[in-house]
Amino acid sequence: MTVWMRIRAALPWLVVGALASLVVIVALLPAAWVTPQFSRATGGHVNLVDPDGSLWHGSATLLLAPGSDRSASTLLPGRIEWRTAFWPLFTGRVQMRMRQTQAMPDAITINASLRGATVSAGAMAVPASLLVGLGTPFNTLDLQGDVRIGWSDWRLFGQDVFGQLTMTINDVSSRISIVKPLGSYRAVWQAQGANSTLDLSTLKGPLFLEGHGTFAGHASSFTGTARADDAQRENLAGLLNLLGHPIGPGTVSLTF
């Protein structure tokens, strides 16, 4: 057997060995390499901090911030934990199971490849005070209450995203209002490719919020109303003035 024939016979095994080494290297990347990707993708609003472990098996803490300035950020109690499956890496896919020890004990599955990514349906419960870290208007309102978030399967293909997320806030109160609770509310985010919509509705008052928003690329708009129950109109007058411009008795417009 000539040298070239030997090289030709060994080449497939060399390629397999190189690919296996690359997969192992990627899988053993430290968690500190993974976490900055979340910050860049969300403009600094959603961050994974205090990472531990690796891409293979690691954990981190969720931090919400108004942007690059983290001085007013908030932390979600508990840890986000993930495990990456080994064999899918050989087919060019990343398959990861992720859970949050306190807010989301039931794990979700993330599948990603060069063609796109999917996130399985899930749900989590967080305190409304966590939203303060997102900045205005949440830091001004300083909301208290229980937030429950549920979502369908989400699919990402290039710049197009498909899925639905529903957030329900029960018995909301605010430090700037003597009326407690203000009410319970539901917001539904529907992603439809390059466009998405947001619908806000009230489950119970005395503060009633309604609105609809559209988002397409860098363009976005939201219009709605905030209205006080007649019995609490006087007590809610100050909060209504902060939320929008008066358009009627005990009613203001919401425009963002």
Task: Give the role of each language-model region.
Residues 70-82, 101-107, 134-151, 179-186, ...:
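Amphipathic hydrophobic-ligand
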Residues 153, 158-194:
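Short helix-loop boundary/capping segments
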Residues 31-50:
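Alpha-helical transmembrane signal-anchor/signal-peptide segments
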Residues 64, 100-102, 171-173, 204, ...:
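Transmembrane beta-strands of outer-membrane beta-barrel pores
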Residues 8-30:
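Hydrophobic membrane-insertion alpha-helices, especially the h-region
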Residues 1-16, 35-41, 177-256:
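Extended terminal
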Residues 46-139, 152:
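N-terminal beta-strand/beta-hairpin edge segment
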Residues 99-105, 112-154, 191-198, 227-256:
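Extended amphipathic, helix-rich lipid-handling scaffolds
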